Amino acid sequence: MHSTPIQDALVPMVIEQTSRGERSFDIYSRLLKERVIFLVGQVEDHMANLIVAQLLFLESENPDKDIHLYINSPGGSVTAGMAIYDTMRFIKPDVSTMCIGQAASMGSFLLSAGAEGKRYALPNSRVMIHQPLGGFQGQASDIEIHAKEIIQIKQKLNKALADHTGQPIEVIENDTDRDNFMSADEACDYGLVDKVLTRR
């Protein structure tokens, strides 16, 4: 069984008193009851499947109540990230996003994809945007195919970032050409988040 960074760490347990006695939950399951999802660590297929499942479950529980997605991620797989992105856009509840720590690469893309007016960052968090990374070895014809694919993905991500931030596509193309790090306030000015929160 594949494990995630959360599974590898010691996960706190919460004990609740109910009319039927005590029930114990791991902290993430307990927070899921409050409609809080954590996107922590590398964005990869296993993590994406878990987040998609949680989004769909919370929609089935209440399609009218916001879902809160907390992000602390260095980024990762574009296809895994797009599975989360498409599900966020597909479901009925608004998905509010919050950057805690860092949201880089695909993490920043998902941060910007939160519901309008409900995208937040904590004051010391960092955000980084850049173009998708590619690495492929093989025959020249296969490399050419993969190069075309990554250019198409880059164009699609840039268009979505332009839509979410309100920045012109030319600005996005220029700013994502290399790693572009921002403070929480800079990310807010850029349009990646709507507000920097210092207190609840």
Swiss-Prot record:
A GO cellular component entry from the record? endopeptidase Clp complex
UniProt-listed GO biological process terms: protein quality control for misfolded or incompletely synthesized proteins
Q: Which GO terms describe its molecular function?
A: ATP-dependent peptidase activity; ATPase binding; serine-type endopeptidase activity
Which keywords does this Swiss-Prot/TrEMBL entry list?
Cytoplasm, Hydrolase, Protease, Serine protease
| Reactions this protein catalyses | Hydrolysis of proteins to small peptides in the presence of ATP and magnesium. alpha-casein is the usual test substrate. In the absence of ATP, only oligopeptides shorter than five residues are hydrolyzed (such as succinyl-Leu-Tyr-|-NHMec, and Leu-Tyr-Leu-|-Tyr-Trp, in which cleavage of the -Tyr-|-Leu- and -Tyr-|-Trp bonds also occurs)
Cellular compartments annotated: Cytoplasm
- The EC number on file is 3.4.21.92
Q: Name one Pfam family in it.
A: CLP_protease
Q: Which PROSITE patterns match?
A: CLP_PROTEASE_HIS, CLP_PROTEASE_SER
EC top class named in words: hydrolase
Active site, renumbered: 105 (nucleophile), 130
> What NCBIfam families does the entry give?
clpP, PRK00277.1, PRK12553.1
The task this protein performs is described as: Cleaves peptides in various proteins in a process that requires ATP hydrolysis. Has a chymotrypsin-like activity. Plays a major role in the degradation of misfolded proteins.
Q: Which PANTHER family match?
A: ATP-DEPENDENT CLP PROTEASE PROTEOLYTIC SUBUNIT (PTHR10381:SF70)
**How does it associate, per the subunit comment?**
Fourteen ClpP subunits assemble into 2 heptameric rings which stack back to back to give a disk-like structure with a central cavity, resembling the structure of eukaryotic proteasomes.
Similarity comment: Belongs to the peptidase S14 family.
Full protein name: ATP-dependent Clp protease proteolytic subunit
**Where does this protein come from, organism-wise?**
Hydrogenovibrio crunogenus (strain DSM 25203 / XCL-2) (Thiomicrospira crunogena)
Taxonomy, top ranks, is: Bacteria, Pseudomonadati, Pseudomonadota, Gammaproteobacteria, Thiotrichales
- List the gene name: clpP
